[in-house]
Regions:
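Non-heme di-metal
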Residues: 2-364
Length: 364
């Protein structure tokens, strides 16, 4: 629950009520992604089909009777989480977000399932048991695309779980928090639709090879902690997409699959917004708690045993507003060395001056 947002802090539900989250965000140390407000204000994105030249609108989707029967964002999110078929989950996600935007429904309150519903395939195994490309039965481009589809499907559930799980605290967090993560869920559902379409064009489908459940296990770690959820999911898991995206694009180009590389490049471009949303809300909640974001982020990673691995795409992370000193120990070590070097230089200068003064005194 929100009252355990940071176990080492003095945050309580009552103190949070006295100081509701402010939407102002001014800090020279944490510059926002320049496109955040444009992303928030943009109209519904119906470009869920990948055409000859890129994303384009798909044929109109008939409204789902289930989505039409509920009256709040949280209830619709719980419905998406309880849907096992991946393509249906993707479609319902878009319908739910569209209805909430068009009808201006309330956030409401609901409870998420213990785990999101999943199809019989793919088989979920330990990450070490994921077959190598040559043993997967898929060509390299389909192998990489299947892995990305799995990430995007999990990302749909991760975003909706954040909406639903913390819906009892909508008065504390504010509607914008839920609007942001519902939009993230809609983006992820579009990304999965593109991956699924491209897999079908290659003659494969999601579920044709095993996948891991690592992403959801990371989500479960933060099920009672909104600050940890923000740290672990957008600032670690989503940020890994910024690192991996350009490398994946280059591998696909090298394989000769330009169309799939274009899909992946567009997904990587849109993931910047998701990391930026995480940074915005993580810093906002930390400010509300009177905690410095950088040490708080590091403390949470240690507490929840979350490892941040490189290589890092520093430029994309910086664009999203994620400061390098939060996650890169090498930067901190380098800064320490530079500080020590400056101290050493100052001491050497002082010693040199003392020697000169001593020599002058002797000459006198």
């Amino acid at each position: 629950m929100l009252s355990t947002a940071l176990r080492s802090s003095s945050l309580t539900i009552h103190s949070f009520k006295l100081k509701p989250i402010s939407y102002s965000y001014h800090s020279s140390h944490h510059p926002l992604w320049s496109g955040l407000q444009t992303w928030r204000d943009s109209s519904l994105n119906h470009n869920r089909f990948w055409g000859p030249s890129g994303p384009q609108p798909e044929p109109p989707i008939d409204p789902d009777s289930q989505v039409g029967s509920v009256t709040s964002l949280a209830e619709m999110g719980a419905m998406v989480l309880s849907t096992s078929d991946p393509l249906t989950k993707s479609r319902l996600s878009h319908l739910a977000y569209s209805r909430w935007r068009k009808e201006k429904l309330s956030v409401g309150v609901s409870q998420p399932p213990h785990r999101p519903a999943r199809p019989p395939k793919p088989q979920l195994v330990s990450p070490k048991d994921i077959p190598a490309p040559k043993n997967s039965g898929l060509p390299l481009n389909a192998y990489m695309l299947h892995n990305l589809a799995h990430v995007e499907l999990n990302a749909i559930d991760l975003a909706w779980d954040t909406v639903v799980r913390f819906s009892p605290y909508s008065e504390l967090l504010g509607d914008m928090f839920f609007a942001d993560f519902a939009r993230v869920a809609d983006d992820e559902s579009r990304h999965f639709a593109w991956c699924s379409q491209r897999l079908a064009e290659l003659g494969f489908s999601y579920g044709d090879m095993p996948a891991h459940n690592l992403l959801w296990r990371e989500c479960e770690k933060s099920s009672d902690d909104v600050v940890a959820r923000l740290a672990v999911i957008p600032l670690v898991q989503e940020a890994r997409g910024l690192d991996a995206g350009p490398r994946l694009v280059q591998k696909l180009i090298g394989f000769g699959d330009k169309r799939t590389s274009n899909v992946v490049a567009k997904i990587a471009e849109e993931e910047v917004a998701h990391v930026a949303v995480g940074v915005y809300w993580f810093v906002s909640v930390c400010q509300q708690m009177g905690r410095a974001p950088c040490p708080t982020f590091r403390d949470l990673l240690k507490e929840y045993n979350v490892e941040v691995k490189g290589p890092f795409n520093y430029s994309a992370r910086e664009e999203a507003g994620l400061p390098r000193d939060w996650y890169d120990p090498l930067k901190e070590s380098k800064e320490d060395e530079e500080r020590l070097s400056k101290v050493h230089d100052r001491l050497a200068h002082i010693i040199s001056m003392e020697k000169e003064n001593s020599n002058l005194n002797r000459e006198e």
